[in-house]
Design a protein with these regions (language model features):
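Glycine- and acidic residue-enriched flexible segments with recurrent GG/GxG motifs
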Residues: 1-201
Length: 201
């Protein structure tokens, strides 16, 4: 439940609140982005969905189990991903997308270490810029990873990847993930849930 509702012709950041399931309120920073938001990713909360696939090389392995733990929204919709790779191995969950060369694309997702031994380990996200990886250092709390890249080709795969040769932590890593989003924008925009099609809100 919002404290207030209003409209304006620009963007701003303000403090909002929402009701907690066990009573009371939690407060958070919210951005009142004016305009439609299109999440280009499909199955933004289900990484077993048909538009996501595994990409493996060398000794890489990946396992995805859906709806295993509470999401940042306090619903049982976050997935568990287990990846294992060493050396030149690659273990990734990917989705193929179209893009316009030179345009910015912003990607975001929520991550959390699944086990105590995974806290502090690093996984990677590769977005629209080929060869550019963003580090995600896992915590025992939900953290949102945000990044913006310019597209280097007319198509790319968004990779949630374990690739030690590019800086992820060698060996097995298990983490929770929820709320992946890609927008054709120069900044990360408010989250929009998707299923089997891109959604605009």
């Amino acid at each position: 439940e919002d404290i207030f509702t209003y409209t304006r012709a620009s963007s701003a950041t303000f403090t909002n609140r929402r009701a907690k399931k066990n009573g009371g309120y939690e407060y958070f920073l919210d951005t009142d982005y004016v305009g439609n938001v299109t999440n280009l990713l499909k199955y933004s909360e289900d990484f077993t969905g048909s538009d996501w696939s595994s990409s493996l090389s060398g000794d890489g392995s990946v396992s995805v189990i859906s709806n295993t733990t509470l999401s940042p929204n306090n619903d049982m919709t976050a997935d568990t991903i287990t990846v294992n790779a060493t050396g030149l191995g690659i273990a990734a969950v990917v989705q193929s997308l179209s893009s316009t060369v030179g345009n910015p694309y912003s990607v975001s997702a929520y991550f959390k270490a699944a086990r105590p031994q995974d806290v502090g380990k690093t996984i990677l996200i590769r977005g629209a810029a080929s060869g550019t990886y963003v580090n995600v250092v896992l915590s025992d709390n939900w953290l949102k990873s945000n990044s913006t890249q310019q597209a280097s080709s007319s198509s790319f795969t968004l990779d949630i990847t374990h690739r030690p040769s590019q800086g992820s932590t060698s060996g097995e890593i298990q983490f929770y993930i929820w709320g992946a989003q890609l927008t054709a924008s120069a900044k990360v925009l408010p989250y929009v849930k998707t299923l089997d099609v891109a959604v605009t809100k």
